[in-house]
Amino acid sequence: MEDKTPIISFRNADIVNGEATVIYGLDMDVFPGDFVYIVGKVGTGKTSIIRTIISENPLYKGSGTVCGYDLKVIKEKEIPYLRRKMGVVFQDFQLLMDRTVEDNLLFVLQATGWKNEEQMHKRITTVLKAVGMELKAHKMPHQLSGGEQQRIAIARSLLNEPQVIIADEPTGNLDTETADGIMKLLTGINKDKGTAIVMVTHNRQIFEKYPGRVMICKDETCYEQKADEVIDLDITI
């Protein structure tokens, strides 16, 4: 039977950035297998939603649950456990530049409680194969292209078999062809594994070419709209 319990759910939630409220009354559900885009102009609260989802920004008003955790009452010590249930991919990759690809991934596994060396190396091999980077395990990040570094970042996000991948402008620093490859990878993970994906983007071509649900951030609100009806946004490639 299909699971209809949302992985992410907000009801009448006010999203803050520091002391300022940037979005009022957010209603949003993300279910297993969903691909949800968050789009809008710069400064409309897109990244603040992401930061709230990963419990980097607090939730004071309204309700919000992510991977079974209530964001209004989550304890500081519980936040690492919440984040283990999700994968996070950033625009700037955030790889550790002083260690190899394999050691980057090993660091994450050790930090999230893995102990068995054989199991860790097996998991690293599995995720690198999933993103087509199995031959790059012993490379340093600076030896990789931007697209390859982003593939490694996606592999890192898959290590703990997340319920959802949170991607903040994952194609923002990439050329069109490389960005297309990253989108094929993400949509493949979404379809093949049923992993939900929430992705911030400013690139209209992406959500037109790779269909998903579209949430628009505008005028201190965020609401769902059909992709082919998104005509009033000043967002560019």
Positions of predicted regions on the chain:
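Catalytic Walker B motif of ABC-type/P-loop ATPase nucleotide-binding domains
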Residues: 165-168
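Short coil-to-helix segment of the ABC ATPase nucleotide-binding domain corresponding to the Q-loop/switch region
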Residues: 98-107
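ABC ATPase NBD coupling module
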Residues: 71-87
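Conserved ABC transporter NBD signature motif
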Residues: 62-70
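A short, proline-enriched helix->beta-strand linker immediately N-terminal to the Walker B motif
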Residues: 159-163
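Helix-to-loop junction immediately C-terminal to a conserved catalytic motif
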Residues: 54
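Conserved ABC ATPase signature
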Residues: 140-150
